[in-house]
């Protein structure tokens, strides 16, 4: 078993969160709140109402959880590749890469869902204790990640932490399959024959493009996931489930709403996944050179 990939994935994921969190907050608000009509309008209103602090609401828990989920994704991916190669007694194909990425994306949902719903709810909480404008000074519902986590458990039970888990799996399975296939293909194409490891410029470019392609696939289901996670926070629940949310959203807002945050997803994904893969590659090479880690 490749243990190094679990650790390296954890390091890469944590660094990626730190880089991309402000734009992730903007993305979630655009997806779930009609008052925000575009990227710059959302950024300006957030700064005016909440200050810079508004972009970092709920970041502590995602750094912890995404560190774990990224570990699961990369570790599962690498070990699935190893298993498929061993079973077939042959080199891995692109289909192997795709299926291993799919397995990694689905596997991490059980770990990711609780932290993700807390992240989304805190990001969509526009009331701020740190408001820079007194007229916007309204007490927020959640005082922080732990309070939000406990409030969800108290109001909805443990199952509330997994509201939106199905669309999360439907988002991350195909998204990570595309993600790893894109990275693998670009690295292979851009690395000269006979060279064992890709150059760092290739790693950075391939990681950035992989992130964008993964989000291009995952954005529509990401909208559904975010809406289900926010449903009922400000009153009565609107959606009965995934299909009902999909139907109502399409009927009332049109198909375009599923791609409203695609631009910011791609804008955020490129630098984030440059960092994720760069840190992952550095870490995995160092760890594999250590005598006790394979």
From Swiss-Prot:
Residues passing through the membrane, by range = 3-23, 54-74, 97-117, 173-193, 200-220, 262-282
Solcar repeat ranges are: 4-83, 95-189, 198-286
Fetch the InterPro entries from UniProt: Mit_carrier, Mitochondrial_Carrier, Mitochondrial_sb/sol_carrier, Mt_carrier_dom_sf
Which PROSITE patterns does this UniProt record tie to the protein? SOLCAR
Q: A Gene Ontology molecular-function term?
A: transmembrane transporter activity
Does Repeat count among this protein's keywords? Answer: yes
Q: What keywords are annotated for this sequence in UniProt?
A: Membrane, Mitochondrion, Mitochondrion inner membrane, Repeat, Transmembrane, Transmembrane helix, Transport
**GO CC annotation:** mitochondrial inner membrane; mitochondrion
Primary subcellular site in the record, as a coarse category = mitochondrion
Please verify whether the record's keywords include Transmembrane helix: yes
- Record Gene3D superfamilies: Mitochondrial carrier domain
Annotated membrane topology is: Multi-pass membrane protein
Against Pfam families, the record matches this protein to: Mito_carr
Record's subcellular location: Mitochondrion inner membrane
Q: Which family does it belong to?
A: Belongs to the mitochondrial carrier (TC 2.A.29) family.
Q: Which PANTHER family match?
A: MITOCHONDRIAL BASIC AMINO ACIDS TRANSPORTER-RELATED, SOLUTE CARRIER FAMILY 25 MEMBER 47
Protein name, UniProt field: Solute carrier family 25 member 47-A
The organism of origin for this protein? Danio rerio (Zebrafish)
Q: Which gene encodes it?
A: slc25a47a
